[in-house]
Amino acid sequence: MRKVSLLFAGTFLLLGLSKTSYGQASATANVSATIIAPIAITKTNDMNFGRAAATAAAGTVVLTPAGTRSFTGGVTLPSFGGTGDVSPAIFTVSGAPNYTYSITLPTTATTIENGANTMTVDTWTSDPTPTGTLATDGTETLRVGATLHVGANQAPGLYTSATPFTVTVNYN
């Protein structure tokens, strides 16, 4: 009887030493992801400085993103015969509605040519700058202006770029 009592006592002792944890809890969670429309940029209109007259002194024509022009040095902007088709470069940026994006303009000059005659375009500006926000329809108009450098006694003619300039947009 004593052996049975010791056996029961030992069993209860071992049972008392076993640990049952009541301090644990578990939960689950779902996973999701949203893919937004990729950002895109499309040219709507090429840049055009319009008509300018060169003199014996070099100068510049500044075209703002709003499409207004000013001049410095020996360049004049004739009022007779019209100004020509003056326009900043216009792009449509599209993507996810209400998202912001950064704008990267060229950092180097672009050369425009008329045969062997050349001029350079640089000092790029944009509206908006340096970031834009897409509207609720996912689009925004981006306008780019620049400065045209006209040489002294620049040869008359239509000057165009052989290589277009690049504007880059990226989501912020």
Predicted features, each with a name:
Residues 42, 110-120:
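Short aromatic-acidic-glycine turn motif
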Residues 1-4, 18:
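Positively charged n-region of N-terminal signal peptides that target proteins for export
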Residues 5-12:
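Sec-dependent signal peptide hydrophobic core
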Residues 22-104, 131-172:
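N-terminal small/polar-rich segments of proteins
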Residues 117-133:
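Extracellular beta-sheet repeat scaffolds used for adhesion and glycan interaction
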Residues 14-22:
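C-terminal segment of classical bacterial N-terminal signal peptides
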Residues 103-111:
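Short acidic, flexible loop segments centered on an aromatic residue
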